[in-house]
């Protein structure tokens, strides 16, 4: 309540704080005195009423006896109340006195022995406390002048005169000497005359205040105000002294600041103390209470310094919010976010019930991801706690009305292809993918939501898991059922889950950020989500061809971390590929969701190692080369989205062949190891060749091919945040490895930095032979 006002400062602020606190204490004492006076008046009134019954005694002894007892009881109660008030008053004064002593000790480090002059000169001459006669105004000296001269005396004077005499026999002696000792002499006569008058009382007008009170060094107006405060208590007792005490003082001290005459509220807003009450008087001295409402009086003419900052600021800031209900606050915050992001209209999408609901929930997630509404919506599914809100569906709906609608409907190849090329449509496609996955089957919808939640929360569900969860893939959507089957295979899922738990967590981290990439055309592919791609149910009809393609696309982008590193904004090869093929279109629809992941990953330092998704996708391709997956997945080359588009078919073919032969082997071989190793290490290490099939791939395939694939893997990995890729990869690798993969080689070679090397060894030291790359 006594928050000081004025500009911040060290010593100055302390003085202001002390002054504000003293003023609050003074106001509290005045309030207590007023309460005591009113109580005394009541008692006197009750006593005055008592005589009238006496004359009525002849009236009737019994009648008189009853009223007398009542009056006596009332009088006794009043006397008890009065005694309590007096005790409270005494306790308050004692408390103030103790506070005064504590302040003087803590801030001034001054001995409180009243009989001897304080050894201010004997303090350590550290320069900070040094008291030189040269007039240096150190913090300690200024504080001493304020605190010792005025604070203690003022508080002492607040006590009864007799008590003040006992407590402080000599004001001049009690006060510590300070730099401006030249102003002290005025006090010495007071000390000599202490027997004649109370220490706090002021001499007659013969000794004007101005001679000694204005302390040129540091006191300021506080010094002028405090003398008046000193006399205030006595002034209330002796009205004649008030005039003398207030001489030369510009503040009407007998009138407390109006701000102290208002109800107080604790900062928690739970307790309210009405103005005229003992608790209010005590609360005035506590900074834990604020005025219930701002008042222009707050500043008060008497303390202009305090007014600007006084309780008013506290009132506005603390009382309002403090009293505001939690739910109301949350709603207001959400509304504010919605307005900031212009997403107040979740009805954009034709998602129906989910659209608006998710949109309402998505504003903050969208913000976090930095996505457009559609992108945010999609990632909302993965963002922790977002799914519950229905953020993904909503975001998608909000972001792109048309695409979102598609999202709920099975995605069709043409629609996706048309929308995918467009940046905006990509997010919508990704949203659609997400929604389509949800829509593919009610069960898959519910399941996918959990999976998304898992992603967002760090509990990543392997792609295979997701596939299992969403048993009803839009088989019509998949160009290659075999690929879908491989994706669905449960055994890889379980294996991948076991192996890649930690990588998944990392993936989750990345997955939370990928939203940003959706906005970019490349982003559509960039965030291949194992869940979407791997979940046939999630793939829309348009996606059918992309089933494998998405996996391949993921692999290609994810292969080279350097690629993703080079392209902070993931170049979405899948998007480029999607325009070429109808399944690619669907893949793009799939990729937009993945693109979101890619973008987040790209921001995070795109994963530099092949993600498990990439590896698993390759393994799948190898295992299902016979199935008509469409053109080999394009390797995401540094060329970017456009180049990737041109290459996709070739790259995919190449990838297929490679994945069928060596890549698949490595994916299968490394699946168990890499899921844990690569995802974790991918963050730190970046190398164009690092992900190239981990060296084996490079050797098995042409350098260029390996590099391209590595770049693709890098993009996919970076975009997917390696998290989704890892999940999908572990699951997929076992599946694809079963049919076409050669037995897992006992030795897997990886080009890695020392840090990565350590991480790999920590997981499977004997299984991997690591080549350190400078």
From Swiss-Prot:
The C-terminal PDZ-binding motif may mediate interaction with the PDZ domains of DSH (Dishevelled) family proteins. This is Dapper homolog 2. Can form homodimers and heterodimers with DACT1 or DACT3. Interacts with CSNK1D, PKA catalytic subunit, PKC-type kinase, CSNK2B, DVL1, DVL2, DVL3, VANGL1, VANGL2, TGFBR1, CTNNB1, CTNND2, CTNND1, LEF1, TCF7, TCF7L1 and HDAC1. A motif (PDZ-binding) lies at residues 771-774. It comes from Homo sapiens (Human). Residues 188-225, 295-319, 345-500, 624-710 are annotated as: Disordered. Residues 655-672, 686-700 have a biased composition (Basic and acidic residues). Residues 637-648 have a biased composition (Low complexity). GO terms for cellular component: cytoplasm. Keywords: Coiled coil.
């Amino acid at each position: 309540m006594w928050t000081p006002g004025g500009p911040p400062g060290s010593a100055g602020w302390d003085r202001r704080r002390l002054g504000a606190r003293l003023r609050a204490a003074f106001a509290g004492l005045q309030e207590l005195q007023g309460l005591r006076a009113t109580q005394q008046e009541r008692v006197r009134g009750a006593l005055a009423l008592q005589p009238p019954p006496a004359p009525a005694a002849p009236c009737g002894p019994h009648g008189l006896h009853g009223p007398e007892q009542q009056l006596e009881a009332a009088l006794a109660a009043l006397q008890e109340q009065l005694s309590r008030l007096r005790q409270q008053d005494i306790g308050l004064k004692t408390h103030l006195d103790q506070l005064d002593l504590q302040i003087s000790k803590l801030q001034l480090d001054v001995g409180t022995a009243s009989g001897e002059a304080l050894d201010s000169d004997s303090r350590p001459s550290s320069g900070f406390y040094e008291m030189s006669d040269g007039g240096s105004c150190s913090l300690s000296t200024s504080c001493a002048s304020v605190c010792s001269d005025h604070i203690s005396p003022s508080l002492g004077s607040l006590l009864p005169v007799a008590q003040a005499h006992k407590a402080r026999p000599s004001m001049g002696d009690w006060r510590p000497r300070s730099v401006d000792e030249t102003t002290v002499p005025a006090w010495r006569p007071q000390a000599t005359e202490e027997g004649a008058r109370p220490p706090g009382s002021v001499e007659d007008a013969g000794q004007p205040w101005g001679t000694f009170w204005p302390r040129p060094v540091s006191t300021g107006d506080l010094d002028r105000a405090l003398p008046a405060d000193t006399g205030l208590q006595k002034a209330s007792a002796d009205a004649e002294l008030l005039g003398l005490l207030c001489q030369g003082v510009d503040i009407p001290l007998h009138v407390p600041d109006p701000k102290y005459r208002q109800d107080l509220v604790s900062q928690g807003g739970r307790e309210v103390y009405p103005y005229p009450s003992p608790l209010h008087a005590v609360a005035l001295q506590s900074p834990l209470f604020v005025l219930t409402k701002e008042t222009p009086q707050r500043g008060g003419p008497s303390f202009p310094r305090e007014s600007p900052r006084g309780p008013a600021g506290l009132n506005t800031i603390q009382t309002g919010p403090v009293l505001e209900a939690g739910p109301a606050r949350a709603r207001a915050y959400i509304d504010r976010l919605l307005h900031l992001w212009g997403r107040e209209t979740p009805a954009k999408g034709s998602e129906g019930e989910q659209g608006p609901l998710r949109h309402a929930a998505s504003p903050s997630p969208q913000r976090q991801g930095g996505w457009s509404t559609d992108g945010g919506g999609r990632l909302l599914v993965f963002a922790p706690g977002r799914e519950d809100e229905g953020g993904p569906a909503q975001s998608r709906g909000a972001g792109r009305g048309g695409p979102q609608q598609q999202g709920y409907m099975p995605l069709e190849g043409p629609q996706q292809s048309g929308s995918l090329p467009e940046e905006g449509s990509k997010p919508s496609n990704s949203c659609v993918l997400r929604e389509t996955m949800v829509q593919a089957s009610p069960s898959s919808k519910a399941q996918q939501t959990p999976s998304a939640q898992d992603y967002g929360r760090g509990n990543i569900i392997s792609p295979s898991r997701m596939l299992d969860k969403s048993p009803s893939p839009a088989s019509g959507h998949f160009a290659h059922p075999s690929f879908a089957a491989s994706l669905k295979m449960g055994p890889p899922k379980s294996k991948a889950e076991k192996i890649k738990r930690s990588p998944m967590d990392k993936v989750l981290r990345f997955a939370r950020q990928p939203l940003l990439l959706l906005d970019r055309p490349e982003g559509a592919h960039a965030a291949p989500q194992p869940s979407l791609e791997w979940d046939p149910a999630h793939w829309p009809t348009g996606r059918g061809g992309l089933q494998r393609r998405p996996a391949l696309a993921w692999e290609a982008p994810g292969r080279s971390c350097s690629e993703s590193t080079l392209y902070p904004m993931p170049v979405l090869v899948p998007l480029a590929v999607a325009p070429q093929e109808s399944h690619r279109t669907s893949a793009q629809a799939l990729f937009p969701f993945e693109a979101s992941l890619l973008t987040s990953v790209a921001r995070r330092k795109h994963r530099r190692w092949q993600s498990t998704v990439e590896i698993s996708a390759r393994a799948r391709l190898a295992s299902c080369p016979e199935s008509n997956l469409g053109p080999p997945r394009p390797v995401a080359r540094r060329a970017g989205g456009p180049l990737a588009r041109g290459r996709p078919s070739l790259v995919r073919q190449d990838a297929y062949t490679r994945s069928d032969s060596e890549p698949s082997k490595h994916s299968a071989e490394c699946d168990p190891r890499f899921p844990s190793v690569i995802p974790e290490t991918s963050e730190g290490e970046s190398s164009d060749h690092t992900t190239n099939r981990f060296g084996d791939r490079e050797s098995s395939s042409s350098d260029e091919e390996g590099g391209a694939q590595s770049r693709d893997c890098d993009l996919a990995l970076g975009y997917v945040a390696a998290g989704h890729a890892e999940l999908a990869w572990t699951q997929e690798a076992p599946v694809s490895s079963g049919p076409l993969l050669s037995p897992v080689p006992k030795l897997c070679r990886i080009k890695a930095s020392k840090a990565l090397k350590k991480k790999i060894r920590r997981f499977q030291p004997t299984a991997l032979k690591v080549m350190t790359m400078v």
